[in-house]
């Protein structure tokens, strides 16, 4: 889980637009966030395995 201070800091508009970054909407993780879903890879995998994301399933070949 991300620190609450870092989540609050990321929510503010940065002085320069290039300094903005995405965070996971569920856990607040700053790295490996999928833009299409707005969540990180950890939460994406967990939710996909539980069947909470429609149209997404684990690949098997």
From Swiss-Prot:
GO terms for molecular function: rRNA binding; structural constituent of ribosome; zinc ion binding. InterPro entries: Ribosomal_uS14, Ribosomal_uS14_bact, Ribosomal_uS14_CS, Ribosomal_uS14_sf. Its cofactor is Zn(2+). PROSITE patterns: RIBOSOMAL_S14. Signal peptide: none annotated. Zn(2+) binds at residues 24, 27, 40, 43. Part of the 30S ribosomal subunit. Contacts proteins S3 and S10. HAMAP family: Ribosomal_uS14_2_B. Belongs to the universal ribosomal protein uS14 family. Zinc-binding uS14 subfamily. This is Small ribosomal subunit protein uS14.
